């Protein structure tokens, strides 16, 4: 489920907040965008005459320490009586000691040094905390002499490179009665990188929110996050895994009225009701696609509300400025009108491609953790069909427009749509009671239309939509049995013009157009992927996201492995079940490909299994490791759940224990975001006696190895022979060795035998700790014929090297 990104790899989380109650409405006449006087002062800020000389001055900001050995600090001009920035020229040093052990290891791996220590001679700072007072107190008055270009360079970086409106973020704190906690350092280093940024924000650092601290580089050819974590105090207080809540608002309801013309130009009106989750809130940040330009923002009484939205090519973050602050728990409603192109593309012949998936309306942004109720009206050209999230309440024609009205059955993390000149075919399920509707465009898009003729045929997908319809229908029934029922009763399976990826929103799936084509056409298009499994699993994977990502959200990029990994795992269930007698072969082939994805080196020479734990998410991708993130999150997340399934499986009840675990997880966390630790607690609730005794009553051993670690054991039979005892029963002589791990690594390793008939029989699980061996003579009572062979890890029960 890909996300549009800015300078980081997870969806942007600019802290939001909003309003309700006409008593707080803007009283001044409507103003042009970005016209707020205080904001303009921040936007055009420069250095003042105030400066101090510092010697061996230490400024500690959470895990970072800035030592200004000698030099001059010049401050920016005050705004609203507060100084929000400074530049330093001289001799300085920055050290970083992450409070998270995993981040400390990752930083050492990245720098190839035990300690992060960066010297610098130039430094720019922006802040809303006590930095000004501390530096002023620790220095002696000076006459200036700083480089004004340092401040200008930091402004250019945030606006042009990172597309992040730092001035608006500072305004949030300036208009709050309480002192802020924002601190941003632009470090021109001499050793690692001359373009480092240390970002500390109680609301969440933009690239890694809700985590508050981030060290990142932003050079042209060297970019990516070096380290990120919560405040050090949260780890000391036992909150480091999940962190303290730091959202400014919760959006309670969205009423969206959207018109999309034949040209794909979008015009929208959003009535957004939100609840303040902080006190003193005046500036609310919202996520809106950059090319959708805001025309106006109004309060409930119709009075205009001031707003910020810079040029689409710069830092176009959308902020609303309230006339008066909100208290925690206050509701506020705003109406935003906006329009623009490029949020939706006209791909020709009645095909449309929504580019803006999560920000085609003013939203909270930040992924799949906040759940909102939606009422939506869509107006599209007459003769076209609309498929959207939620339930269809009505459809009518109004002049030249097709008008549909939709409502979410429950609160959902996102809303979305697909439309065009489409055909629809439905399939009704009785168990569960569910409707699957498939949509295919009547004509191919322009890019495909140019390929018509010859061996390619006409590339029409209408006749081919029965397959994704039947796959989705089967997957819904299968997954309901494993994970429990969905909270809604309809799923729209649509075709998108993108060829090689799918995506899933609540009740709505976008499938790649090329998944509708057969093998011959895909070969002609050069889409012979090495594993070829992709085309078999793209539909069941995206359907599985109705549970993983939509019904159960994820708290942050640290937890996204559950969404993508669980969906990938679900696809393996589909292969095993839906392919009949070939299911076992497809299932084993799937896990073989997942392991290869983790253990084969990419073009940059890295293996996904080695670059970091799965909780690093897309942060594992950077200019050094390449685009390796998806090769970690999808297969590693899938393997983790697969291993849990196999540990819970037993001869008598099969998957029953696993089903109870997953259904409990969905029931407990449906309609909200879950964390990795939430899932761990759920596994511990349902673990069997063997798992419990092996881990002293917890699953720490397993999660430390595979979720928070990068372990990859190897297994080898030193001995695997069969004798017979005096009664003629087979005796299995086994010595199984575990290697390639540390001394604390432990695993329950499954052993199987293949009988002479070819049937596979599960013997049991060997308990292995560290680099050691399990050696035993096992009588197989009642078995007279010697088995063909013994097999370790037959179903890829344990993620291990292939030997």
Model-derived features: positions:
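N-terminal, polar/Ser/Thr-rich
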Residues: 26-267, 295, 366-368, 700-705
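Amphipathic alpha-helical substructures
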Residues: 278, 487, 630-734
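Beta-strand-rich binding/interaction modules
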Residues: 279-284, 290-301, 387-388, 696, ...
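Zinc-dependent metallopeptidase catalytic helix centered on the HExxH motif
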Residues: 352, 369-370, 375, 473, ...
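Acidic/His/Gly-enriched intrinsically disordered linker/tail segments
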Residues: 564, 568-643, 647, 669-670
């Amino acid at each position: 489920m890909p996300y549009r990104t800015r300078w980081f790899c997870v969806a942007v989380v600019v802290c939001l907040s909003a309003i309700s109650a006409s008593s707080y409405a803007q009283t001044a006449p409507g103003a042009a965008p970005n016209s707020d006087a205080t904001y303009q002062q921040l936007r055009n800020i420069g250095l003042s005459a105030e400066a101090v000389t510092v010697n061996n001055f230490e400024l500690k900001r959470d895990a970072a320490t800035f030592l200004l050995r000698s030099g001059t600090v010049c401050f920016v001009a005050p705004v609203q009586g507060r100084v929000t920035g400074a530049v330093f020229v001289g001799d300085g040093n920055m050290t970083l000691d992450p409070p998270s052990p995993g981040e400390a290891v990752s930083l050492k791996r990245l720098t190839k040094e035990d300690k992060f220590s960066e010297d610098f001679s130039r430094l720019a700072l922006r802040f809303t905390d006590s930095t000004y007072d501390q530096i002023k107190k620790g220095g002696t008055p000076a006459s200036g002499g700083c480089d004004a270009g340092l401040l200008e360079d930091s402004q250019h970086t945030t606006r042009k490179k990172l597309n992040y409106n730092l001035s608006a973020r500072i305004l949030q704190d300036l208009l709050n009665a309480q002192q802020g906690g924002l601190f941003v350092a632009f470090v021109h280093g001499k050793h690692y990188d001359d373009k480092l940024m240390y970002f500390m924000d109680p609301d969440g650092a933009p690239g890694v929110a809700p985590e508050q601290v981030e060290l990142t580089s932003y050079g042209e050819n060297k970019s990516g996050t070096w380290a990120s974590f919560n405040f050090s105090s949260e780890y000391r207080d036992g909150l480091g895994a999940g962190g303290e809540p730091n959202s400014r608002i919760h959006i309670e309801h969205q009423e969206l009225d959207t018109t999309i013309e034949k040209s794909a130009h979008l015009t929208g009106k959003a009535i957004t009701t939100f609840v303040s989750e902080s006190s003193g809130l005046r500036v609310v940040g919202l996520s809106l696609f950059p090319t959708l330009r805001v025309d106006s923002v109004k309060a409930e009484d119709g009075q205009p509300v001031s707003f910020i939205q810079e040029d689409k090519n710069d830092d176009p973050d959308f902020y609303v400025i309230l006339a008066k602050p909100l208290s925690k728990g206050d509701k506020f409603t705003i109406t935003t009108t906006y329009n623009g192109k490029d949020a939706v593309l006209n791909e020709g012949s009645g095909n449309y491609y929504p580019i803006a998936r999560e920000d085609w309306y003013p939203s909270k942004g930040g992924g799949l953790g906040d759940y909102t109720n939606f009422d939506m009206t869509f107006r599209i050209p007459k003769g076209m069909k609309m498929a959207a999230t939620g339930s269809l309440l009505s459809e009518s024609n109004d002049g030249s427009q097709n008008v549909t009205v939709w409502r979410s059955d429950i609160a959902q993390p996102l809303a979305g749509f697909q439309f065009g000149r489409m055909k629809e075919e439905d399939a009704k399920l009785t168990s569960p009671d569910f409707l699957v509707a498939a949509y295919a465009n009547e004509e191919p898009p322009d890019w495909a239309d140019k390929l018509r003729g010859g061996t390619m045929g006409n590339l029409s997908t209408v006749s081919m939509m029965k397959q994704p319809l039947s796959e989705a229908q089967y997957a819904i029934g299968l997954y309901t049995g494993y994970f429990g029922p969905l909270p809604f009763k309809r799923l729209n399976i649509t075709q998108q013009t993108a060829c090689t990826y799918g995506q899933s929103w609540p009740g709505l799936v976008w499938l790649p157009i090329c998944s509708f084509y057969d093998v011959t056409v895909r070969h002609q298009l050069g889409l012979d992927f090495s594993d070829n499994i992709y085309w078999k699993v793209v539909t069941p994977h995206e359907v599985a996201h109705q549970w993983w990502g939509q019904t159960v959200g994820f708290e942050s990029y640290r937890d996204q492995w559950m969404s993508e990994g669980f969906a990938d795992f679900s696809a393996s269930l589909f292969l095993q079940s839906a392919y009949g007698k070939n299911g076992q072969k497809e299932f084993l082939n799937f896990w073989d490909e997942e392991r290869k994805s983790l253990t084969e080196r990419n073009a940059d020479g890295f293996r996904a299994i080695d670059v970091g734990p799965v909780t690093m998410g897309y942060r594992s991708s950077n200019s050094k490791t390449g685009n390796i993130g998806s090769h970690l999150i999808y297969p590693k997340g899938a393997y983790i759940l697969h291993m849990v399934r196999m540990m819970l499986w037993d001869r008598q009840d099969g998957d029953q224990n696993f089903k109870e675990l997953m259904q409990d997880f969905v029931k407990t966390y449906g309609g909200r975001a879950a964390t990795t630790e939430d899932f761990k607690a759920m596994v511990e609730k349902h673990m069997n006696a063997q798992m419990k005794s092996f881990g002293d009553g917890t699953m720490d051993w397993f999660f430390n190895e595979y979720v928070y670690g990068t372990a990859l054991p190897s297994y080898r039979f030193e001995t695997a022979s069969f004798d017979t005892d005096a009664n003629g029963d087979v005796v299995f002589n086994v010595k199984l060795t575990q290697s390639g791990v540390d001394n604390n690594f432990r695993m329950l390793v499954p052993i199987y035998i293949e009988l002479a008939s070819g049937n596979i029989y599960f013997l049991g699980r060997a308990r292995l700790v560290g680099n050691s061996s399990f050696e035993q003579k096992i009588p197989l009572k009642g078995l007279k014929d010697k088995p063909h062979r013994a097999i370790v890890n037959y179903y890829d029960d344990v993620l291990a090297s292939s030997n």
